[in-house]
Amino acid sequence: MAPPSVFAEVPQAQPVLVFKLTADFREDPDPRKVNLGVGAYRTDDCHPWVLPVVKKVEQKIANDNSLNHEYLPILGLAEFRSCASRLALGDDSPALKEKRVGGVQSLGGTGALRIGADFLARWYNGTNNKNTPVYVSSPTWENHNAVFSAAGFKDIRSYRYWDAEKRGLDLQGFLNDLENAPEFSIVVLHACAHNPTGIDPTPEQWKQIASVMKHRFLFPFFDSAYQGFASGNLERDAWAIRYFVSEGFEFFCAQSFSKNFGLYNERVGNLTVVGKEPESILQVLSQMEKIVRITWSNPPAQGARIVASTLSNPELFEEWTGNVKTMADRILTMRSELRARLEALKTPGTWNHITDQIGMFSFTGLNPKQVEYLVNEKHIYLLPSGRINVSGLTTKNLDYVATSIHEAVTKIQ
């Protein structure tokens, strides 16, 4: 008799919530259905948007007979890496001028986080540092915990961030938790458009955060998934990163070009490394090369070529910033419109937090039972946390969504 399958005892894993939500939405035959769960930009017709500048550059690449499908270097396309790091740090960055910056092309922002986490687990402040505490915001993007756990970190903690009562930043709690963190802890920071809350510190608050991190010798690991996409302004969205450079920090910054280029399925990311001197950057990159080699070996070229071609050409760069502003402005408009409708309906509670927040997501303050009502009764799909993708709102569904939220809040406590 043949033995049972070697896979017979494998337990069924829970589906990834945000992707299951989209699958449920697709299968729902109700014509009123609205998807506010997906983490991607949508037009006012609820369609994905291929940026006009991306179409133009793709055509240019297709017509370039000098290009081929040879392997890229392990660390990626050199022009892409330098352009990406420059976008985050700014043309006049002292770190760039002093040649103490390195970049690693990665598979999206998640890949950049993972390469950085793997490196830190092996080499941060010595060797084998899996017991170093890693701090993530409460709440945070769920993959932050998963990536650092998978890299072997055993002590993942949260710092206070969201004040549910005020529906804003718990700055004092944030600062207190940093103050009490063991020296040399790693702190994951959202560079802009915090996911899922949409609440960002002001420049003055960032200064306070940096001050505490400096005297506690804490290591910043920025996650920059929305530069330009948050406010429509590339410089404003990179303010915190550039301030930390000016304060002399060494840090990592995971960059994603999924949102601001609309290149979701091309997996275009970059890990920017800022050190104290050029020599240490070369040493760090040499070890990261080893990690990449056993992880994905070589990155794909197409998305990196699109981004590098755009960022290195002044005309295309200007067109791209216009495309990004189009997306950011539509989201800002949808925020204002949703708030206005809820206030006109006299929906219980305050709704100014919707316009105080920034970026693609809004933490509505809806509780899990209210969310359940919206999903089951109104066919409006959103995460149990109450997070919505604001770009899922359109001029056609705004009234329906607002009245449905009003019903949920009024009927269900």
Curated annotation (Swiss-Prot):
Broad class of enzyme this protein falls into: transferase
UniProt-listed InterPro entries: Aminotransferase_I/II_large, Asp_trans, NHTrfase_class1_PyrdxlP-BS, PyrdxlP-dep_Trfase, PyrdxlP-dep_Trfase_major, PyrdxlP-dep_Trfase_small
Role according to the record: Biosynthesis of L-glutamate from L-aspartate or L-cysteine. Important regulator of levels of glutamate, the major excitatory neurotransmitter of the vertebrate central nervous system. Acts as a scavenger of glutamate in brain neuroprotection. The aspartate aminotransferase activity is involved in hepatic glucose synthesis during development and in adipocyte glyceroneogenesis. Using L-cysteine as substrate, regulates levels of mercaptopyruvate, an important source of hydrogen sulfide. Mercaptopyruvate is converted into H(2)S via the action of 3-mercaptopyruvate sulfurtransferase (3MST).
Known EC number: 2.6.1.1, 2.6.1.3
A GO biological process held by the record: negative regulation of collagen biosynthetic process
Catalytic activity from the UniProt record: L-aspartate + 2-oxoglutarate = oxaloacetate + L-glutamate; L-cysteine + 2-oxoglutarate = 2-oxo-3-sulfanylpropanoate + L-glutamate; (2S)-2-aminobutanoate + 2-oxoglutarate = 2-oxobutanoate + L-glutamate; 3-sulfino-L-alanine + 2-oxoglutarate = 3-sulfinopyruvate + L-glutamate
Keywords associated with the record: Amino-acid biosynthesis, Aminotransferase, Cytoplasm, Phosphoprotein, Pyridoxal phosphate, Transferase
Gene designation: GOT1
Chief place where the protein resides: cytoplasm
Cofactor(s), by name: pyridoxal 5'-phosphate
Quaternary organization: Homodimer.
SUPFAM superfamilies xref list: PLP-dependent transferases
Localization: Cytoplasm
Protein name stated in the entry: Aspartate aminotransferase, cytoplasmic
Modified residue annotations for N6-(pyridoxal phosphate)lysine: K259
Keyword Signal (UniProt): no
GO molecular function: carboxylic acid binding; L-aspartate:2-oxoglutarate aminotransferase activity; L-cysteine transaminase activity; phosphatidylserine decarboxylase activity; pyridoxal phosphate binding
GO cellular component: axon terminus; cytoplasm; cytosol; extracellular exosome; nucleus
Taxonomic path: Eukaryota, Metazoa, Chordata, Craniata, Vertebrata
Other known facts: In eukaryotes there are cytoplasmic, mitochondrial and chloroplastic isozymes. Aspartate aminotransferase activity found to be increased in cerebral spinal fluid (CSF) of patients with Alzheimer disease. Fetal serum levels of the enzyme in the umbilical artery and vein are found to be significantly higher than maternal serum levels.
Protein family per UniProt: Belongs to the class-I pyridoxal-phosphate-dependent aminotransferase family.
Modified residues (Phosphoserine): S149
Residues holding L-aspartate: G39, W141, N195, R387
